[in-house]
Amino acid sequence: MELSRVLDNEVKLRNAIYLLMSIVNDTAVPRNIRRAATEALNYLRDERYTPGVRAANAVGVLDQVSQDPNMPLSARTKVWQVIAILETIHD
């Protein structure tokens, strides 16, 4: 049972990383939002912490930037998708 949860968390992290990479590579997204997405990516890739801690750190960054009124709707939707994925990751 433990192995399936670990694998499930890894799949969720990969999906979140993929969505964040699409935000980082989108030049239509303002620089401060791309910077926050990069910071969230760095948290997700930091192997020193458990998946739950990495996800919580990334959610903190993304939640703050999701309130930005200059964020394009497509990027906001992706940020919300990432937050929804990351909130399901537990240790």
Swiss-Prot record:
Q: Name one Pfam family in it.
A: UPF0147
Domain of life assignment: Archaea
**InterPro entries, A to Z:** Ta0600-like_sf, UPF0147
Q: Which Gene3D superfamilies match?
A: Ta0600-like
Q: Which HAMAP family match?
A: UPF0147
Per the record, the similarity remark reads: Belongs to the UPF0147 family.
Q: What is this protein called?
A: UPF0147 protein DKAM_0139
Organism, scientific name: Desulfurococcus amylolyticus (strain DSM 18924 / JCM 16383 / VKM B-2413 / 1221n) (Desulfurococcus kamchatkensis)
